[in-house]
Design a protein with these regions (language model features):
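Catalytic domains of carbohydrate-active enzymes, especially glycoside hydrolases
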Residues: 1-7, 35, 39-40
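Residues that flank catalytic or metal-binding motifs in active/ligand-binding sites
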Residues: 2, 37, 78, 114, ...
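Aromatic-rich peripheral "rim/lid" segments of glycoside hydrolase catalytic domains that contact
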Residues: 7, 198-205, 209, 216-286, ...
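Structural detector of well-ordered beta-strand residues that form the stable sheet scaffold
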Residues: 7, 82-83, 187, 239
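Early extracytoplasmic/lumenal segment of secretory-pathway proteins
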Residues: 10
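Active-site cleft segment of glycoside hydrolase catalytic domains centered on the general acid/base Glu
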Residues: 15-171, 178-183, 191-215, 247-260
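A short, local hydrophobic-aromatic micro-motif
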Residues: 39, 116, 189, 236-239, ...
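Extracellular/luminal regions of secreted and cell-surface proteins that mediate adhesion/ECM remodeling
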Residues: 273-405
Length: 405
């Protein structure tokens, strides 16, 4: 149905000290990639969880599997978006697991791990090694590849700890920024209440947690940590657990008769009250070639504008016209190329359009990008549709040595 997005998950399995397998694979995976152009692909599901029902792979194995799948998918569909992580919860212990993944990737492949986004779960679970304390190792255990007796210890009553939930979201965004991934989206692909009703988590308590977290995720932003393409919001998309799984809690529909539960009705009532908004703006301007060197002959430069939508519409809004100018169009700036168009859903989605700028000469140039110049689309912020970017066409190039470790 309209507005529903399905995200594919490729499950991982460690087969030896360095070996791995994944599912789907072979022709089944290739066909899925071809039949779903531009799809998001989650690589692994809770790879940091020691259990037979989750992926349970050591960090170096995750890095190797991710590398293989990233390039396999991108070679088949360059528009695909590859999402890393999907850890159980962003605690310090599990961020250490991800740091080990990144370190292994760099050691093995000589570069930073490429991602199109990060995914996390955010359940509030105990972290105790079953080898250390078998009587109290319920929850998330200790990630494979890490030998610690415990990490973050919580009680069953903490399963709806809202302050802890928020703290973890901020912690992960800080982790992303510190490792150079701030300009990537964050997806909270699974969270909710796992403790069953007979543990004290009846529907009213679950619904209260749902409402608080939904309100937070809808509005939480940080000018130094958030995703710039989405108004600096911390989380771009999230998914409540679960739709029908009654083995835990939070199910929106009865798995037997398909009827909506009290939690499902709360979900529907809460989300139906959220007004749909659109907010398009120019985000980045890139050039091809990346470095512009003038040697006496005017250059032909490809200007590539990335346009983002920080509204919340699940359905693409458009087409919206995008225009390029050399100089401020309000003061006689000269239009570059023909009109281009974008059709974007919200929550930080980005589209790229380009024009060719001919006759570029040496100097500093102000290139303006204007989105929805004719005001066809109603937006929550009409003041951010125009942005100027500085493009330098230099006359000299300096080559400097680079050392890496």
């Amino acid at each position: 149905p309209a507005g529903v997005e399905f995200v594919s998950v490729i499950r991982l399995s460690q087969t030896s000290e360095t070996g791995f397998s994944y599912s789907p694979s072979g022709a089944a995976l290739t066909n899925a990639i071809v039949n779903n152009p531009g799809a998001r692909w989650l690589i692994g599901n809770e790879p940091d969880r020691r259990t037979s029902i989750q992926d349970n792979v050591e960090p170096h194995v995750y890095a190797a599997a991710y590398h293989e799948l990233y390039y396999l998918i991108k070679q088949t569909d360059p528009t695909a978006r590859i999402i890393a992580g999907t850890i159980v919860q962003p605690t310090p212990l599990r961020l250490r697991y991800l740091d080990m993944v990144l370190s292994s990737y760099r050691q093995s492949f000589g570069t930073t791990m490429p991602v199109d986004g990060w995914s996390i779960h955010n359940f509030i679970l105990n972290e105790v090694s079953c080898a250390h304390d078998p009587g109290n190792c319920w929850g998330a255990e200790i990630p494979p590849g890490i030998d610690e007796p415990f990490g973050e210890i919580v009680s069953v009553e903490d399963n709806d700890d809202f302050d802890r939930f928020k703290e973890r979201v901020v912690r992960f965004r800080q982790w992303m920024k510190d490792r150079g991934y701030r300009e990537k989206p964050l997806y909270l692909s699974e969270y909710g209440i796992l403790m069953p009703p007979d543990y004290g988590f009846e529907a009213p308590r679950v619904n209260a947690y749902m409402n608080k977290t939904f309100n937070y995720l809808t509005t939480a932003a940080d000018a130094t940590l958030g995703f710039p393409a989405d108004g600096n919001r911390l989380v771009q998309k999230w998914s409540w657990y679960s739709a029908t799984d009654q083995n835990y809690n939070g199910w929106l529909f009865d798995s037997g008769n398909g009827q909506m539960t009290a939690m499902g009705r709360n979900f529907a009532n809460h989300t139906s009250s959220i007004a749909i908004s659109n907010d398009l703006s120019p985000w980045k301007l890139l050039t091809t070639p990346a470095t512009l060197h003038y040697t006496g002959t005017p250059l032909s430069v490809q200007l590539r504008a990335q346009v983002s939508s920080s509204g919340n519409s699940a359905i693409p809004t458009g087409p919206a016209v995008v225009r390029f100018y050399r100089g401020d169009p309000a003061q006689g700036g000269v239009k570059i190329g023909a009109d281009k168009f974008v059709d974007l859903a919200g929550c930080g989605n980005v589209a790229e359009v380009s024009v060719t700028w001919t006759g570029a000469t040496a100097g500093v140039h102000n290139i303006f990008v204007v989105v929805d110049a004719d005001g066809v689309i109603a937006e929550s912020d009409e003041a951010n549709n125009t942005r100027s970017f500085t493009v330098l066409v230099g006359t000299r190039r300096l080559f400097a040595p680079i050392t890496t470790r």
